C-alpha cells in the first residue's frame, strides 16, 4: 500500500467532487469518518468496490485505474478520514 500514490490518484481523479473529503454532488455523503461509518463505507473493501464500480452519480473507475491505484486511493481515504481531513 502506497498512501502517497493514493493521494496522487485522489488529487487527479477524485478531488473535483471530493476535495477535502466533501461531496459536491451529494453533500450528506462525504468521506468524513462519521459519514463513512454511517454509510458502512469505512473499510477498504467497500471503498474499493465503489471506486471500481461506481454508484449513482459517481462514475466507475475500474476501467481507468489499476487495482493497485484503487487500493491505494481507498487506503488514502481511510487514512484521511481518521485524521479529520
From Swiss-Prot:
Its main location: plastid. One of its GO terms (biological process) is photosynthesis. Heme c binds at residues 14, 17-18, 58. The keyword Electron transport applies. The keyword Protease does not apply. GO terms for molecular function: electron transfer activity; heme binding; iron ion binding. It is found in: Plastid, Chloroplast thylakoid lumen. Pfam families: Cytochrome_CBB3 (PF13442). Keywords: Chloroplast, Electron transport, Heme, Iron, Metal-binding, Photosynthesis, Plastid, Thylakoid, Transport. Monomer. Functions as an electron carrier between membrane-bound cytochrome b6-f and photosystem I in oxygenic photosynthesis. Belongs to the cytochrome c family. PetJ subfamily. This is Cytochrome c6. It comes from Petalonia fascia (False kelp).
Amino acid at each position: 500500500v502506497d498512501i502517497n500514490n493514493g493521494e496522487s490518484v485522489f488529487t487527479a481523479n477524485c478531488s473535483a467532487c471530493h476535495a477535502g473529503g466533501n461531496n459536491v454532488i451529494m453533500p450528506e455523503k462525504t468521506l468524513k469518518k462519521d459519514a463513512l461509518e454511517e454509510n458502512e463505507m469505512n473499510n477498504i473493501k467497500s471503498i474499493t468496490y465503489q471506486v471500481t464500480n461506481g454508484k449513482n452519480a459517481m462514475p466507475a473507475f475500474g476501467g481507468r485505474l489499476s487495482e493497485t491505484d484503487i487500493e491505494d486511493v481507498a487506503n488514502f481515504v481511510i487514512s484521511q478520514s481518521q485524521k479529520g481531513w
